[in-house]
Amino acid sequence: MRPMVASIKTALLLAALSFTAAFARADTYSWTNLQSDIPGVATHADPNLVNPWGMAVPSATGPIWVSDNGAGVSTLYNQQNGTARSLIVTIPTAARNKGGGNPTGVVFNGTSFFKVTLNGNSLPGRFIFVSEDGSISGWNPGLDATHAIIAVDNGTNNGTNRAVYKGATLGVAKGHNFLYVTNFRSGQVEICDENFKRVNPTGFADPNSTGATRHSEFATLMVRFL
């Protein structure tokens, strides 16, 4: 019986090794640089991809929308191969900003809310952008195919009230949609209702908002709705 036992042990060992090897192969990844603003670094070169920050997708197969902080635009890339699409969306600036746009966070909006207005016409911003100059803007091709439109300008405020936005996300609470944006300057997460109006909901208290560790000592960067 010893040979049979040995054979069984050998078979089990080989099966275990095969399983381990298969599992290891399934858990490995290869790194491919698809896009860069620097020629020769990636498979494709895009001069607009300067300091890319936020990313958003409208669907599982839709293009990736990227906030190009250093170029003031949003560029689009195919998920399948990383190639760039022809559409380039210019992000507007706060009134106080005399330079170019500096978008950071971006989020896809599939709701009928968060409307932006141009020439008396209002449509939902399909992609909502926040910027370091304190502006929040939305893009809808029915209003302007190549430019986002300002919805909020908190970059003209004085002192600590002047916003520096870094991240954005959407969420639903009590049946209503809300936009959450991080204000790097104030160290807070600001909340806007479906009309881009800032709200101050109750029910949450930050134990570090007073005392030795005040919120002003922190700089909020990104945000996610759980």
Give residue ranges: language-model regions.
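Bacterial N-terminal signal peptides
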Residues: 9-21
